[in-house]
């Protein structure tokens, strides 16, 4: 059974797409599918998506006309079969224990969403895949009302407004 559907919208991402996909494939938790949504790329990204799909049975590719980021994410959602859904941008690199850690907390807390922080890099030379995820002391259980109040009060808005850095329960 597929636990997580990872949706990666791709548009003109040739220079960093392989690093993104490789970081997802390196996950310690292997109960996932990857949905690459090529949003009309003309830089060779579409071909990279197809190459990975040929080698990995867990990867599905959707090719569509350019419709923007939300359109690409929605196309991925239409075929997502996982119990949970995660969005990763094509220029993102994820920690090798990200899924394992997030799923553990979600199941222990019976939560619908897991929100984690993001680190921004101008350029990544080498990704530290050995660093331990420090989750023990930073888990907060918040109700929808608490999150809503933080959004409207401007508290850590960047943590809540992006689709990335979250694992959502799929109520499909």
Language model features: what each stretch is:
Residues 1-172:
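Nucleotide-sugar donor-binding/catalytic module of glycosyltransferases
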